[in-house]
């Protein structure tokens, strides 16, 4: 997850969940938006534009995975 100001993570589970949801919304919106563009204009897009959109979708997917991996790692380290 994105480090909060001051570097301290919320200790309250509800606050942590709210931050996780917030951090996932941006890349998820990117995936949804570019996928819809590809779906609507699949025949009108040239290969370069289609490749750009697919690249952005892939990058957003990697960002979401990283956010979730970081959260999992943080939770596991708290259990130790």
Predicted regions located by residue number:
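Conserved C-terminal segment of the DHp
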Residues: 30, 34-45
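Conserved signal-transmission helix
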Residues: 1-13, 54, 74-76, 80
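DHp/HisKA dimerization-phosphotransfer hairpin of two-component histidine kinases
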Residues: 42, 48, 55-58
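Residue-level recognition of alpha-helical structural elements
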Residues: 13, 46-50
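Short alpha-helical segment of the dimerization/phosphotransfer core of two-component systems
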Residues: 59-64
